[in-house]
Amino acid sequence: MDNVQDKVTNTKEMPKHPFPVVPTTKILAIGQFTKAPTPEQLKEIFPKEVPATLRLYLEGKIDQWWIRQTQTGPVFLLNVTSLEEARALMEQLPLGQAGLMKHEFIELGPLTPLHLLLTDGGGRNDNL
């Protein structure tokens, strides 16, 4: 997207914690309009945006999607493991191509405290 910087919440930049590092298994993409679309833009872009989003769902790239109740813009749970792929998917959508949508990307992975339930051998931890 031209002149629109996406915000990235990168887990590698977060404070250290006592749990093992886990892989990124999904990415949450939180969209927000960069400016209100005009009625003309809505008529032109939205008939393309919905099928393009549905295509990504049918290709398995979008797992789930929602709309926020307090702001405009979609929230997508993406079945991708890299920020680069997530960004490319969102930028290819018509609203992204028009520069009307920016995204915050959050890398997600397995719940790390679950490691406390395992010993080094992968079994039960009797010290809990």
Model-derived regions: residue spans:
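Conserved, structured core segments of small domains
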Residues: 2-128
